[in-house]
Amino acid sequence: PASVALSAVTVTVNGTNVTSAFAADPEGNHQLEGVVTGLPLGKSKLVARAAGPGKSRRHRDSLTLTNHDIQGPMFSGPRQVPFVCATPNNAAGLGLPPIAQSETCETATVVSFRYRSTTNQWLDYDPASPPAPSTIQQVTTLDGETVPLIIRWERGVINRFMYSIAMLSPASQGPAPDFSAWNGKLLYSFSGGVAIGHTQGAASSGDMLHLAGLGLGYAVIYSSGTRTNTHYNLQLGGETAIMVKDRFVSAYAEPEYTVGVGGSGGAIQQYVYGQNHPGLLDAGVPQYSYPDMVTQTIHVGDCELVERWLDSKVLADPLSPWRTWVNRTLVEGLNASAVIPNPYAPVMPYMPTPGSSECINGWRGLSP
């Protein structure tokens, strides 16, 4: 209440005084702000009390805080098993140590530096023996500052998936982030594809090191857990996105805004996470996305299954009506033709060639 001086408020967590972690709101609101670290896993009770005399002593409020393990889960449910870790053999080329790991695929966080060469390659940058400045590309950020394209690149594991944080680092290449060329904005790079999980996945260097975004001064975050080519559990993906962004906010800074970017499954994630987790994304750039989620995902889910069923009928009976391409339209509701080439003809010798269906040309091979 306005009647209580902020200096009279005491804050405790599980009975321990943490008042020193809080300060007055810099925007002038009558409230305290702060970050409490070192919480145990599970639930903790935060209590705020007014320490002044008289009635102000009656002012007391509490909040239950739940601290989750960095490998989750928070709300996505039991972990999927079996689950294959990809970092022990360094399959993703992340530079993570190839060591035996726990069932959560946890490994040490790695920070290194790279630069974009004038030959359009990402190369390792050694601060102790830097390359000649003339071999490093120059970029101009949104703020109009021209700097060498040198980046700080953090990789590790969050929620069992590989994550990446990259940002320009032209002024220094030390342990602490260099904010000199950061435009204050965050880009979340989402990826598409289709998969059923059970693996940590593979990371995309193109998505992790989003060249256009980095060159403009954005910080770029990424996770193999927000790549639908790893899994299509959007509860798990949303949870992972929250945790990866929280890592950036905690270890770097609060961005002015966060914008998503990505195509196909990367676009769908932006729609769903924007709907389910307000505040995670402030804007999105969904690319080659579906015009609507209700009618278009029918083909994604059904085409592969229907085509396989029709194929099974032809394999069982070479005289099956489903060996005639145009008949498949009766079931699928999509075009079929006896003159269009079939990209899968080598593995479909039981079907006449040429000939194909819209289901095959558009969606076959998409499902795992």
Predicted ranges, named:
Residues 2-368:
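C-terminal His-loop and adjacent cap/lid subdomain of alpha/beta-hydrolase
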